């Protein structure tokens, strides 16, 4: 059985882990870690201590400012993507333990497409550039 790292829990809410195959469970935001526990298999869990968090990127829908999911990027172990029942409330609870400059907005489809379109002239120029 998994042992929680938190001594106090600020928020516990139903969530979906979007890593590979999706799994449903509960997210707990506490004083020492962000924790996810699978509801079907208690041995399937993710515990991310606050000092291991590099930054958190939230996917915000354009116009509505609704947060659909967020990803926690760690210093060593890659990233973990979650969607909770109320992502905004979850990130507000996380903000208590993570600096605000580490909470960033993830680029959406239009941002990525615009950046790619702006880079086309540079790519074409580099194709015909003679190297010394």
Residue ranges and their predicted role:
Residues 1-29, 103, 116-131:
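Anionic N-terminal interaction surfaces
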Residues 88-116:
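Pleckstrin homology
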Residues 9-12, 80, 104-111:
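Non-catalytic membrane-recruitment/adaptor modules and adjacent regulatory linkers
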Residues 2, 35-36, 78-83:
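Short, surface-exposed beta-strand/loop "edge" segments at domain boundaries and coil↔beta transitions
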